[in-house]
Amino acid sequence: MHLTELKNTPVSDLVKLGEEQMGLENLARLRKQDIVFAILKQHAKSGEDIFGGGVLEILPDGFGFLRSADSSYLAGPDDIYVSPSQIRRFNLQTGDKIEGKIRPPKEGERYFALLKVDQVNDDKPEVSRSKILFENLTPLHANSRLRMERGNGSTEDLTARILDLASPIGKGQRGLIVAPPKAGKTMLLQNIAQSITHNYPDVELIVLLIDERPEEVTEMQRSVKGEVIASTFDEPATRHVQVAEMVIEKAKRSVEHKKDVVILLDSITRLARAYNTVTPASGKILSGGVDANALHRPKRFFGAARNVEEGGSLTIIATALVDTGSKMDEVIFEEFKGTGNMELHLSRKIAERRVFPAIDFKRSGTRKEDLLTTADELQKMWILRKILNPMDEVDAMEFLIDKLMMAKTNEEFFEVMKRS
């Protein structure tokens, strides 16, 4: 029996399995994690092997637990204990994805324990020992393009195509989506996620939702094929911070194994607010009630995005909230403004006219975009900017959408533009 399979099974099926096949009682009133734990414990009595896996979180005491992505790395009874000797032996770190054989808890124990390590980050455990630490890897400018355009000519693809023209994204990009309320940032993130899973199935995608509404989390889980990790607005700030730390550590471990990872974060403003709440008071308060030391850790999160010379990349596209009426949000945005190497501005004015995507084309852009595009394409993008520059932001967007509708792909659009 495999623990991951049980976690992916709907609760109704788990209750059926436990009550009808294993003779367990009163499962319907338990949390899913408790049901999984009860089924595993019952299964272990029959003497069969049990396999499990998860993402390692090492606690200050030296031992660790394998947390599950399904429960957004929340501590639960179905977590797997990892001993300090195993952590030292395989040079394991927080964020390592581990698979192996597990054993049921003995008398006086509360958790299942890891017996044997079979895989670390989808590689043999021996490979993990010789990898270079993320901090020692050489960061470079993004030079390999992540194209958003799917080429199917749909209205959803229109957003992706405008994104490709306004601010191209590369592997290792550190992007900021600057969004006022109700400008369609969540839909834009969904669109980016769907484009990445469609065009680059080998890229590891993680959508991280901090302080979001529960219904939006469900919608994101159903519309995106990647991993969706969330901490909703009814959770404490410490939980937001723990989730974010787990996600960034997991991404770093994957990059150490030369993989390409993309994190879509909604939103960095709320994450910075959470860090501001949990950071011990330093006595220095900036305007808006932000502690002087509070923004160091969210900056470290955002700053982890990089293209790596030794192979692999970590791309982070985060949304930053503006025009919310909060002085704190303004201060947080100002702090992050110059740190990204790609900015996409959404406009309230365009969204109020019900024109979507509400992208402010003139203010959006990518640094060093010549590394991501061909000289010919770059020339055409500059000509397009010259045409749109004299126009008002709403007119520019409406004009661009009308013209893009005439062609199925951006290449066709440039051909039409050339002829006219």
Curated annotation (Swiss-Prot):
GO cellular component, one term: cytosol
Record keywords, A-Z: ATP-binding, Helicase, Hydrolase, Nucleotide-binding, RNA-binding, Transcription, Transcription regulation, Transcription termination
EC numbers: 3.6.4.-
Keyword tRNA-binding attributed: no
Record GO biological process: DNA-templated transcription termination
Assembly mode: Homohexamer. The homohexamer assembles into an open ring structure.
Listed name of the protein: Transcription termination factor Rho
